[in-house]
Curated annotation (Swiss-Prot):
Catalyzed reactions per annotation: 4-aminobutanal + NAD(+) + H2O = 4-aminobutanoate + NADH + 2 H(+); 5-aminopentanal + NAD(+) + H2O = 5-aminopentanoate + NADH + 2 H(+)
Organism: Salmonella typhi
The protein's name: Gamma-aminobutyraldehyde dehydrogenase
InterPro entries referenced in this protein's UniProt entry, alphabetically: Ald_DH/histidinol_DH, Ald_DH_C, Ald_DH_CS_GLU, Ald_DH_N, Aldehyde_DH_dom, Aminobutyraldehyde_DH, PatD
Gene Ontology terms for molecular function: aminobutyraldehyde dehydrogenase (NAD+) activity; NAD binding
UniProt: NAD(+) binding residues: 146-148, 172-175, 209, 225-228, 280
TM regions (residue ranges): none
Broad enzyme group: oxidoreductase
Note: 4-aminobutanal can spontaneously cyclize to 1-pyrroline, and 5-aminopentanal to 1-piperideine.
Catalytic center residues: 246, 280 (nucleophile)
Single Gene Ontology BP annotation: L-lysine catabolic process
PANTHER family: ALDEHYDE DEHYDROGENASE-RELATED
């Protein structure tokens, strides 16, 4: 198993404190990995800074060829990546193979093509005898911090646009789920010039702070919690670094009386519980109009209770464990707080399961009120709440009454209503009669405390560039 760091094109052992990496399906230790030392973090950043002088000037074609080679290599090693991700995260193996790996490969291939389409504009003559042009240039060294819910996919979302734009990257995966990023490092070593891509391992307080605070780091890209985002913003503010933040969500799912309730129930069964609900866009905050509320609660209860939990390698498993014991305790505490409210009905689930591993039963909580914590705070687990509403204005007000602003969905047969709401919902994405669907060509990112900046799409590529004005006197 690959456990070494990638620094300046060389795989090396970490020199810091050893950390245990767990299998959440069993609670057992997979292996121990040594963190990067402060000296190694410095070496990785300096290597990236040195490599930028040449990599930043390479042609888009050359950068695209490297990204395509990496995509091909991931595809050729798909089963090994899937097994590592499943073992380290508890994800059902078939979900990683069929859903995640193809999407990861596609992200690298999309940005390989996008790199060759990004261009500045010839702006024209705005001053007599002078011609202005616009350039989009790479920024420099980018520090990327990836989360533990989709370790390899989020690494791809960060690496592909940054490298395509001509930046050099030092990435730190979560210390909870580092295995696929370290495997990726071994493949990238023989594809990219030394220093262009560096992969570290370690905790935020020992490695992340040293990395993001380094004077040579020009940009920090984070996918993580609001608390982590606030910390990084405070930590990097004195140096005025560019930041790119994706900080979670609490997606409202608005279901009107005219919606197809069977489609809603099956949709929430998938979109609310995929990856054990550990998804920033999970369909977790349902608002159902009064006329169909009881019927939807019944249909959802039947749908959610039919989800099969089990071992990740079992092909029939739909729901794996949570990522860590600490997170299991957080989810349990959130549900217990909700259950203590007299008006909450537990339709199904509501507790962790017996036996080994960090499993929590798929849970549906009915009759939640707008002010309840279960409605207002991200749980990030297999937990969905449902709240009754009366009219369009009320549900719009409630949906927007959130510090989050990442994703939302509206379920209705009324096209006019769908357009009205999608124009007024304060979320980076609104789906109509579906949820959770993402493609490489379209941007993903939030507003409010869900952060700013876009992943995927040409907008994501532009986020990793600087806009510069060039004026020529003639």
């Amino acid at each position: 198993m690959q456990y070494q760091l990638l620094i300046n094109g060389v795989l090396v052992d970490g020199e810091g404190e050893r950390q245990s990496v767990y299998n959440p399906a069993t609670g057992e230790v997979i292996l121990e990995i040594a963190e990067a030392s402060p000296v190694q973090v410095d070496a990785a950043v300096l290597a990236a800074d040195s490599a930028f002088a040449e990599w930043g000037q390479t042609t888009p074609k050359a950068r695209a060829e490297c990204l395509l080679k990496l995509a091909d290599s991931i595809e050729q090693n798909a089963l090994e990546f899937a097994r590592l991700e499943s073992q380290n995260c508890g994800k059902p193996l078939h979900c990683v193979i069929n859903d995640e790996i193809p999407a990861i490969v596609d992200v690298f291939r999309f940005f390989a093509g996008a790199a060759r389409c990004l261009s500045g504009l010839a702006a024209g003559e705005y001053l007599e005898g002078h011609t202005s042009m616009i350039r989009r240039d790479p920024i420099g060294v980018v520090a990327s911090i990836a989360p533990w819910n989709y370790p390899l996919m989020m690494a791809a979302w960060k690496l592909a646009p940054a490298l395509a734009a001509g930046n050099c990257v030092v990435i730190k995966p979560s210390e909870i789920t580092p295995l696929t990023a370290l495997k990726l490092a071994a493949l990238a070593k023989d594809i990219f010039p030394p220093g262009v891509l560096n992969v570290l391992f370690g905790r935020g307080q020992t490695v992340g702070d040293v990395l993001t605070g380094h004077e040579k780091v020009r940009m920090v890209s984070l996918t993580g919690s609001i608390a982590t985002g606030e910390h990084i913003l405070r930590h990097t503010a004195p140096a005025i670094k560019r930041t790119h933040m994706e900080l979670g969500g609490k997606a409202p799912v608005i279901v009107f009386d005219d919606a197809d309730l069977d489609a809603v129930a099956q949709g929430v069964r998938t979109f609310g519980f995929y990856n054990a609900g550990q998804d920033c866009t999970a369909a977790c905050r349902i608002y159902a109009q009064r006329g169909i509320y009881d019927a939807l609660v019944e249909k959802l209860g039947n749908a959610v209770s039919s989800l099969k939990m089990g071992a990740p390698e079992d092909k029939s498993t739909e729901l794996g464990p949570l990522s860590s014991l600490a997170h299991l305790k957080r989810v349990t505490a959130a549900v217990e707080e909700a259950k203590a409210l007299s008006h909450i009905r537990v339709i199904t689930g509501g507790s962790q399961t017996e036996g080994k591993g960090y499993y929590f039963a798929p849970t549906l909580l009915a009759d939640a009120k707008q002010e309840d914590a279960i409605v207002q705070r991200e749980v990030f687990g297999p937990v969905v709440s449902i709240t009754v509403f009366d009219d369009e204005d009320q549900v719009l007000r409630w949906a927007n009454d959130s510090r989050y602003g990442l994703a939302s969905s509206v379920w209705t047969q009324d096209v006019g209503r769908a357009h009205r709401l999608s124009a007024r919902l304060q979320y980076g994405c609104t789906w109509i009669n579906t949820h959770f669907m993402l493609v490489s060509e379209m941007p993903h990112g939030g507003q409010k405390q869900s952060g700013y900046g876009k992943d995927m799409s040409l907008y994501g590529l532009e986020d990793y560039t600087l806009v510069r004005h060039i004026m020529v006197k003639h």
